[in-house]
């Protein structure tokens, strides 16, 4: 009987010691894994404000996507996934945009606080790209825009943006 009591006491002591270690490791793993952000078919301004009157687009946003946003040291990374089955073989431009930024600032390719890349969807309509950018001083978060060019307009033919600004802070 006393043997089982000692085993139980040792097990309880081990649990008390291991719980904080496990919690720290789980938190560290979550930070390294990044923040999962859903991509919505919403058009946004460069300051992340929503454009309430979307431009007429050739095709509605029929795709679905996510971005895994992480930061390490002084850089932010976005791994962007999009599935647009109705439009296989389509090229999309993808931007990683740092916030805050003034509403008057532009956020196209080459603008400060932005990084752009692109991908072509495969035969199933899937595409993935990873973008990495140095975090500028004062940056508190980043968001992603995915857009397909419209040959007949300056407005994109199809677009997806982050549901929220993912927090980052330079180390």
Region locations from a protein language model:
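Secretory targeting and sorting signals
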Residues: 1-30
């Amino acid at each position: 009987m006393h043997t089982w009591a000692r085993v139980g006491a040792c097990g309880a002591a081990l649990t008390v010691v291991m719980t904080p270690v496990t919690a720290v490791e789980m938190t560290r793993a979550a930070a390294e894994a990044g923040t999962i952000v859903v991509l919505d078919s919403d058009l946004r301004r460069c300051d992340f404000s929503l454009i309430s009157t979307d431009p007429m687009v050739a095709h509605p946003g029929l795709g679905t996507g996510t971005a895994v946003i992480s930061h390490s040291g002084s850089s932010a990374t976005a791994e962007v996934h999009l599935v647009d089955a109705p439009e296989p073989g389509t090229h999309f431009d993808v931007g990683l945009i740092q916030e805050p930024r003034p509403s008057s600032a532009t956020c196209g390719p080459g603008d400060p606080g932005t990084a752009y890349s692109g991908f072509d969807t495969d035969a199933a309509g899937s595409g993935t790209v990873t973008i990495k950018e140095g975090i500028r001083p004062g940056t508190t978060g980043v968001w992603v825009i995915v857009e397909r060019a419209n040959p007949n307009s300056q407005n994109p033919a199809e677009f997806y943006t982050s549901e929220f600004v993912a927090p980052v802070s330079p180390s």
